[in-house]
């Protein structure tokens, strides 16, 4: 997907109150940008490092700027987690995720049990595949990892996928790594051991795991290639 308008370069000053980032534009002006990321962004907030912003002319928005990309060790990292589902929808429409090809149609934000899963794919014969998408930005050593903070919501989604499998459907947890500099993924057991254990249980009960990395530039971002993974 291409960004609708060219991104604006800036420099990171600070992130605070979870959804706010102060940055300095090229002309020296300091602005506050919306940070559409509920995680900790561990290892990604480097004072003075380049970042890239999108701008909205919508007068109803409280903040015109949104933090889209940061730099980590020279690599671009997509920190707008709200894009992950849009990236997957685009990839599904373009058949760029082979294990999720061949479906007649899909729905988004589908209620299931007491949760809501990101996608429900319907095969031509009617079989259902439920997919939950997780945006990954964390780098631990040379591996992509999830989560970057304790996530009770993530465990709830895994429980819904486990239930879907037991009900005779297909359940898939799809990790979208919004960076292109890493080749392997693992659960971040040192950050959230409960989630790592729940993920292993889910896989042992038939939930499928897919991990795909993105290709990123300051003009576009798209789902590009599968990554290897370990669960231990």
Curated annotation (Swiss-Prot):
A Pfam family matched in the record: SfsA_N
Matches recorded under InterPro entries: SfsA, SfsA_C, SfsA_N
Gene Ontology MF terms: DNA binding
Gene3D superfamilies: 2.40.50.580, 3.40.1350.60
CDD domains: SfsA-like_bacterial
Signal peptide feature range: none
Family: Belongs to the SfsA family.
NCBIfam families: sfsA (TIGR00230)
Protein name per the record: Sugar fermentation stimulation protein homolog
Lineage, top ranks: Bacteria, Pseudomonadati, Pseudomonadota, Alphaproteobacteria, Magnetococcales
Gene from which this protein is expressed: sfsA
């Amino acid at each position: 997907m291409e960004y609708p308008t060219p991104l604006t370069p800036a420099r990171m000053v600070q992130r605070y109150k979870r959804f706010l980032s102060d940055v300095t534009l090229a002309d020296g002006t300091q602005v506050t940008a919306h940070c559409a990321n509920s995680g900790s962004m561990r290892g990604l907030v480097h004072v003075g490092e380049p970042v890239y912003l999108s701008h909205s002319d919508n007068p109803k928005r409280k903040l015109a700027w949104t933090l889209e990309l940061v730099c980590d060790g020279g690599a671009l990292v997509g920190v707008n987690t709200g894009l992950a589902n849009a990236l997957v929808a685009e990839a599904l429409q373009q058949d760029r995720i082979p294990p999720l090809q061949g479906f007649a149609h899909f729905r988004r934000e589908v209620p299931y049990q007491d949760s809501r899963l990101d996608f429900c794919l319907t095969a031509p014969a009617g079989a259902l595949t439920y997919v939950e998408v997780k945006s990954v930005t964390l780098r631990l050593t040379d591996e992509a990892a999830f989560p970057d903070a304790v996530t009770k919501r993530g465990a709830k989604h895994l429980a819904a996928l486990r239930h879907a499998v037991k009900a005779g459907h297909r359940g898939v947890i799809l990790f979208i790594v919004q960076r292109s500099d890493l080749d392997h993924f693992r659960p971040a057991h040192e950050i959230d051991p409960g989630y790592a254990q729940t993920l292993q249980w889910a896989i042992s009960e038939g939930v499928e795991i897919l991990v795909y990395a993105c290709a990123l530039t300051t003009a576009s971002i798209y789902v590009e290639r599968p990554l290897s993974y370990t669960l231990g």
